[in-house]
Amino acid sequence: FFSMIPKIATGIASLVKDL
């Protein structure tokens, strides 16, 4: 589970940049 956190965090960060 914790190994997926970096990928999710990166995905959220990229979405925030688009806003």
From Swiss-Prot:
Keyword entries, A-Z: Amidation, Amphibian defense peptide, Antimicrobial, Cytolysis, Fungicide, Hemolysis, Immunity, Innate immunity, Secreted
Leucine amide PTM sites in chain numbering: 19
One cellular component term from this protein's GO annotations in UniProt: extracellular region
GO biological process: defense response to fungus; innate immune response; killing of cells of another organism
Intracellular or extracellular location(s): Secreted
Secreted as UniProt keyword: yes
Keyword Mitochondrion: no
Protein origin, superkingdom: Eukaryota
Disulfide cross-links: none
Free-text tissue specificity from the UniProt record: Expressed by the skin glands.
Protein task: Antimicrobial peptide with weak activity against fungus C.albicans ATCC 24433 (MIC=100 uM). Not active against Gram-negative bacterium E.coli ATCC 25922 and Gram-positive bacterium S.epidermidis ATCC 12228 at concentrations up to 100 uM. Has an anti-inflammatory effect, since it inhibits the production of the pro-inflammatory cytokines TNF-alpha, and induces the production of the anti-inflammatory cytokine IL-10. Has high activity of stimulation of insulin release, which may protect the species from being eaten by predators by causing fatal hypoglycemia. Is cytotoxic to cancer line cells.
Family: Belongs to the frog skin active peptide (FSAP) family. Phylloseptin subfamily.
Descriptive protein name: Phylloseptin-3.2TR
Source organism of the structure: Phyllomedusa trinitatis
Upper classification of the organism: Eukaryota, Metazoa, Chordata, Craniata, Vertebrata
